[in-house]
C-alpha cells in the first residue's frame, strides 16, 4: 500500500481530568471564539459540532483549501445532544411546530460539512458511522484515497457523552466497571513525507465478533508478517485498557434488555482488560506497554485518541520506533493500527 504520512494532529480530549459532577471523563474544551470566529455560526452549533469543527480547523491551520483533496470524519453515536433535543421537542409539541435546526444539526455528516463550508473546501467529503470501527473505516478510506493519488486528506473522529446516554448505557450494563469518555481528534495525512512528517501509518486491520485470546494473537502475528515484522520488532505496544470506575457501581440496578445481551456484558466486565494483559505477556514481553483510555475514557472512536497520543509522545524519539495499537470496543469491534516513527 502507498505510504501514508501524518503531517499535523489536533485533539480535544479530557486529559485524564475528572469532573465531580459528571460520572464520566469530560473533554477540556478550548475558547471557541478564537477558532470559529463567526458568532452566529458558533451559536447554532451544539457542543460536539463545536468540538469537531474547532479541532478540524486547528489541524488544517493555514493550509490552502485547494490542497485538501478530502475530508473524512467518523463517529460512533453522532450528535447526541441535538438528537435528544429534537426528540424531546417532538414529544413535548405532540409532533407539531417543530424547529428543524436540532434535526439538521444532529445528522452525522454535520461536522465534516461545516469544516468544508467554513474553509471553502470543494472536495470528497465522507462520514463513517460503524460503531467501534468508525475511525478505522475513515482511516482506511483516507489511505485508499491517497493510494489513488490524493495529496492531502483530513481525517477526524469525534464522539460525545451525555447524562442521558450514560444513564442508558449503565442500565444496559455496557458501562459496568468501565469509565466512559469523549473527545475529538483530527489528522492531516499526505502522500509525500515532506520535510518533517510526524509519523507514518504502515497498516491497519479490523475484525469483529467475540474472539479468544489465541485467535487475536494469531491475527496480530499475521498482520505483522504482512508488514514484514514480528513481535520482537515492536518497540511500543499500546492497548485500550480501561480504568475501573472510581464511583459507586450501580450494577444491581442494571437492566438487561434480552438474554442475547448477557454474553456481551459478561465479556465487558471480565475480559476487557484481561485480553490486553495476556497479549502484553505472550506476544510483547519486551515492548514498552502503553494505554490510553485512562486519559480519554471509553467511547466508539477512542482509538483516534490512541493514534494522537503515540504520535505526540514519539515526537522526541531518537531511534526508529514501530508502534502497534490494539483496541477493542466492548470486546466486539477489534482494530490493529501499525505506526512507524522514523528519525
Which residues are covered by each model-predicted region?
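Internal active-site segments that recognize and position negatively charged phosphoryl groups
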Residues: 141
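Conserved "HGTGT" condensation-loop signature of ketosynthase/thiolase-family condensing enzymes
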Residues: 1-124, 128-136, 144-150, 158-343
Amino acid at each position: 500500500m502507498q505510504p501514508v504520512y501524518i503531517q499535523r494532529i489536533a485533539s480535544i480530549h479530557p486529559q485524564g481530568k475528572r469532573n465531580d459532577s459528571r460520572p464520566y471523563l469530560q473533554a477540556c474544551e478550548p475558547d471557541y471564539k478564537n477558532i470559529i470566529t463567526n458568532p452566529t455560526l458558533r451559536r447554532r452549533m451544539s457542543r460536539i459540532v463545536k468540538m469537531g469543527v474547532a479541532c478540524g480547523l486547528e489541524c488544517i491551520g493555514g493550509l490552502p483549501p485547494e490542497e485538501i483533496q478530502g475530508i473524512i470524519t467518523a463517529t460512533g453515536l453522532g450528535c447526541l445532544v441535538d438528537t435528544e433535543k429534537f426528540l424531546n421537542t417532538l414529544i413535548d409539541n405532540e409532533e407539531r411546530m417543530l424547529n428543524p435546526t436540532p434535526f439538521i444539526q444532529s445528522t452525522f455528516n454535520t461536522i465534516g460539512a461545516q469544516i468544508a463550508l467554513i474553509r471553502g473546501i470543494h472536495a470528497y467529503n465522507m462520514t463513517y458511522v460503524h460503531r467501534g470501527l468508525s475511525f478505522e473505516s475513515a482511516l482506511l478510506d483516507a489511505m485508499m484515497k491517497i493510494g489513488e493519488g490524493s495529496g492531502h486528506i483530513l481525517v477526524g473522529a469525534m464522539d460525545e457523552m451525555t447524562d442521558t446516554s450514560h444513564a442508558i448505557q449503565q442500565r444496559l450494563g455496557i458501562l459496568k466497571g468501565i469509565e466512559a469518555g469523549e473527545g475529538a481528534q483530527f489528522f492531516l495525512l499526505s502522500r509525500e513525507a515532506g520535510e518533517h512528517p510526524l509519523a507514518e501509518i504502515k497498516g491497519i486491520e479490523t475484525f469483529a465478533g467475540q474472539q479468544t485470546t489465541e485467535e487475536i494473537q494469531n491475527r496480530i502475528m499475521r498482520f505483522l508478517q504482512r508488514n514484514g515484522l514480528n513481535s520482537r520488532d515492536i518497540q511500543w505496544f499500546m492497548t485500550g485498557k480501561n480504568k475501573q470506575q472510581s464511583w459507586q457501581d450501580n450494577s444491581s440496578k442494571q437492566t438487561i434488555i434480552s438474554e442475547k445481551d448477557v454474553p456481551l456484558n459478561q465479556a465487558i466486565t471480565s475480559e476487557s482488560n484481561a485480553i490486553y494483559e495476556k497479549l502484553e505477556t505472550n506476544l510483547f514481553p519486551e515492548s514498552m506497554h502503553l494505554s490510553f483510555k485512562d486519559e480519554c475514557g471509553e467511547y466508539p472512536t477512542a482509538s483516534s485518541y490512541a493514534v494522537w497520543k503515540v504520535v505526540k509522545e514519539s515526537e522526541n524519539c531518537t531511534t526508529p520506533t514501530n508502534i502497534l495499537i490494539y483496541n477493542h470496543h466492548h470486546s466486539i469491534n477489534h482494530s490493529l493500527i501499525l505506526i512507524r516513527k522514523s528519525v
